[in-house]
């Protein structure tokens, strides 16, 4: 693997699994993590992926700056997938982006947006995380 086949998966757990199994993922499949997890002042996700795809998996960087936000993302991603019976959680991703300072906009039918209580909960979850790890999450509204 790496000489005749290139692995590209959208989740960083593959990088850790590759280290265990003796292969190195050389590229990262496009995902929403870089713009949901990073800010202009703290681009830890991009730094981690850049290094990991060159074979330098920095456990300390991941555990300190990325694991908490990844766990929050997994909680919301899985919850929204269950709620929508398997649809990608586009409304959650768009609103998360808004909380990170980007324009998200609304989803198109037949998808439904987050309820106000879900928006409030996600904003609160991100705010709590920001307070715990200031360099990870940008200001939330």
Descriptions of predicted regions:
Residues 67-109:
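Conserved short secondary-structure transition element at the edge of the structured enzyme core
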Residues 8, 34, 82-85, 111:
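Glycine- and other small-residue-rich loops at beta-strand/loop junctions that grip anionic moieties
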Residues 62, 86-90, 115, 119:
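A structural signal for well-ordered alpha-helical scaffolds and beta->alpha junctions
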Residues 60, 93, 122:
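Conserved, mostly hydrophobic/aromatic
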Residues 109-141:
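Long, low-complexity C-terminal extensions of enzymes
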Residues 1-77:
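Catalytic alpha/beta core domains of metabolic enzymes, predominantly
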